[in-house]
A protein has these predicted regions:
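Alpha-helical transmembrane segments of multipass membrane proteins
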Residues: 17-21, 100, 126-127, 150
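Transmembrane helix-loop-helix hairpins at membrane boundaries of multipass inner-membrane proteins
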Residues: 1-7, 19-116
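Transmembrane alpha-helical core residues of multi-pass small-molecule transporters
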Residues: 12, 40-43, 95, 121, ...
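Hydrophobic alpha-helical membrane segments of integral membrane proteins
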Residues: 8-11, 36, 87, 127-148, ...
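Alpha-helical transmembrane bundle and helix-membrane interface signal
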Residues: 104-111, 153-163
Length: 174
């Protein structure tokens, strides 16, 4: 099979994020942005399910390996999946549409940027789970912290953290 399915899984959310980046973020365009992000993440989910059906469970070797020379003799873009990483990829692509669906009223400002951050984070998470080169793993892992930091810093807050902790304390009988 010559189709680079893992690279497609990695790049598809980034393409959706680029599309959202170049669309205007007016109030009437928020629903369109959400549908574009949801469509992109659902296509990625079904692509990961397709990957699961193509996966040979009788072998423990890495499958769907793509190896490209990045810096000769130093770094290769090498991705592949085994029995554990494919489950994490499917889990990531399953949770992302749920996150996009669940932002109905919780994200009121900068919805477009929030959806871009979610899709970019999905890109980096899938890259982490299928990277076979240590440098590529490190780059995906560290780059994944950037959208996570933005999501927590912009849309998270001390007030909501305080509410969640006080609610947990009430439930525990403290």
């Amino acid at each position: 099979m010559n189709f680079p399915i893992l690279s497609s899984l990695i790049l598809l959310p980034s393409i959706g994020a680029l599309f959202l980046f170049f669309t205007k973020s007016k109030s009437e365009n928020k629903i369109t942005a959400k549908y574009v992000a949801l469509f992109t993440s659902l296509v990625n989910f079904f692509l990961s399910i397709y990957l699961w059906f193509l996966f040979d469970q009788t072998t423990s070797a890495f499958q769907f390996v793509e190896d490209r020379i990045w810096i000769k003799g130093l770094i290769n873009y090498k991705v592949g999946v085994d029995g554990i990483s494919i489950l994490f990829i499917i889990l990531t692509t399953f949770i992302t549409p749920l996150c996009i669906i669940s932002v109905n009223n919780s994200v009121t400002k900068r919805l477009n940027e929030f959806l871009i951050a979610i899709l970019v984070m999905e890109t980096f998470m899938i890259g982490v789970f299928c990277s076979l080169d240590l440098v590529v793993f490190y780059l995906f892992f560290e780059a994944g912290l950037i959208p996570m930091f933005l999501i927590i810093g912009i849309w998270g807050g001390a007030r909501s953290c305080l509410l969640y902790t006080s609610d947990a304390a009430d439930d525990s009988g403290c």
